[in-house]
């Protein structure tokens, strides 16, 4: 049960990030906006925590004895989410670069 809750929570975060990632390039075009409010240090700490929890969940699924049906569902879910995760990773990388540049000025 705990594993299912973690999977659903992670899926919710992925969906939220995917929805926000479409608007991210527009926001990044104005460095003043980035500096002012979009990416405080707490945002990046939270993002690191979510990423770490996702990695733990994936490792747990890969190493657990959950049965072939559940592993098949997991594999199918990862196949569907991978393109979205790659787009999110690209956009978050861009946002982080802008964030780092804003800290240097």
From Swiss-Prot:
What residue stretch is flagged as signal peptide? 1-21
Where it sits in the cell: the answer is: Secreted
Biological processes, Gene Ontology terms: lipid transport
The alphabetical list of record keywords is: HDL, Lipid transport, Secreted, Signal, Transport
- As recorded, the propeptide runs across 22-29
Q: Tell me which domain of life the UniProt entry assigns to the organism this sequence originates from.
A: Eukaryota
Q: In which tissues is it expressed?
A: Plasma.
The disulfide bonds in this chain are: none
Q: What is this protein called?
A: Blood plasma apolipoprotein LAL1
